[in-house]
Amino acid sequence: DDLLKRDFKADKPFSKCVTDITEVKGKNGKLYVSAIFDCYDLTAVGLSMDDNMIAELCAATVENTTAAYPEFCGAVLHSDRGSQYTSDSYRAALNEYGVRQSMNSAGGRCHDNARCVSMWARMKNELFYSRGRKSTDYTIEQLKTMIWRYYMSYWNNRRICSSIGGMPPAEKRRRYYSDKTGKPAAAME
């Protein structure tokens, strides 16, 4: 079932998350990147990469996310209807962590998972196209490092996102938890 129905706004962390896979061509092959983004603040909460686009890549992303963020358990996680997301191994990972699966409608359109599609476009533009670079100038190992740093360091902590009030995702998250605890955001670190 499509639990999000193209509504990617969330009023708290881990109430709605989205996931997808993208392909990045490297000098020595293809790299497949699977990520989970929190709709609340656009934080990249989970990331896995491999040279094969198999279901286990997506299951590993779920496992990585729950290891880093135990509060992800119980979230709604939206994806397209790709074979990775309908596989037994992926669904087993969701069930193990109590994550509720949401999938776009049969015969869905790119707008059904627009949040992820736009995140991939931004990453490729900011890492490569806007700098006159090509992903094929880099090896798979170099690409893994670049993409990991882009999301986990730059995107989450420093990139200003206009759609969340002109701040980085980590700042919006700090403010949310600061409001809940009554402690200043700086004390939350």
Features from the language model and the residues they span:
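Mobile-element integrase/transposase regions
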Residues: D1-A35, A60-T61, Y69-G74, A185, ...
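Basic, flexible linker segments flanking DNA-binding modules
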Residues: D1-K12, C110, P168-K180
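Mobile genetic element proteins and their domesticated derivatives, centered on retroelements
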Residues: L4, D20, I36, L42, ...
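Hydrophobic (often cysteine-bearing) scaffold residues that line and stabilize catalytic clefts
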Residues: F14, V33, D50, I54, ...
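Short conserved beta-strand segments at catalytic cores or DNA/RNA-binding microdomains
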Residues: I21-M53, E63-T66, W120
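Short small-residue beta-strand/loop micro-motif enriched in glycine and branched aliphatics
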Residues: D41-L47, Q101-N104, Y129-R131
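C-terminal domain-tail junction helix/linker
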Residues: N95, A121-E189
